[in-house]
């Protein structure tokens, strides 16, 4: 499976137009690198990420120096194992450290900011990172539909003056036909195939993980390749991959 995935991605990258801006995006709720077998395994998660050769990755459910993960900064481990640059945002204090989300990227961000998101059962957050050719947002949304709806105008407000292509990815905790997703669709184009389910990893029966392109500032997105990676063990979610070509204004 890994060889076939690598060859498919390589084919897309080789035959894309040379002048086109193309971005290989992954969204992955890594469940703090605890697999369906209850085993902590950072290398296993890193291997899943690396086999897709991503330009950028949105990660959810990361411990940072907590008692639970024996003082390890999970994103730092994944940085070392993948060779990508990490950007971390704590959502809540947890067991002497924190718990949050992150980005892994080939480029170091020019700058980034962290914006609190609604979350009545647990505080949530959004990372907005600017790169040379695009802006990337990573998030893990609330379990509560009311919070998810409240988050949409906050996201839109944060992005309304950005004049680069914008992507957003994460575990949105909502179904494709839900009210929060319909509200997001007023501002974002969904790039992944929502009929390919992402959760739970061993027997997926729903799509709650998404990759989007922002549709309000004149850029268009041509999906070259998209896939839910068929990994049943590394996390409780399956990772979502999209290779997209950006078309200018």
Model-derived regions, located:
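Structured beta-strand-rich core segments of catalytic domains in phosphoester-bond hydrolases
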Residues: 37-38, 62-134, 224-231
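Metal-dependent phosphoester-hydrolase catalytic domains
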Residues: 114-115, 145-149, 157-167, 173-249
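N-terminal post-signal-peptidase region of extra-cytosolic proteins
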Residues: 37-45, 87-89, 195-201
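Active-site-proximal beta-strand elements of phosphoester/diester hydrolases
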Residues: 22-34, 113, 128-142
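N-terminal, active-site-proximal structural segment of metallo-dependent hydrolase catalytic domains
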Residues: 2-6, 18-81, 93-97, 153, ...
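Sec-dependent signal peptide hydrophobic core
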Residues: 5-13
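Active-site beta-strand/loop signature of hydrolases that rely on acidic residues for catalysis
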Residues: 23-30, 45-69, 136-139, 154-182, ...
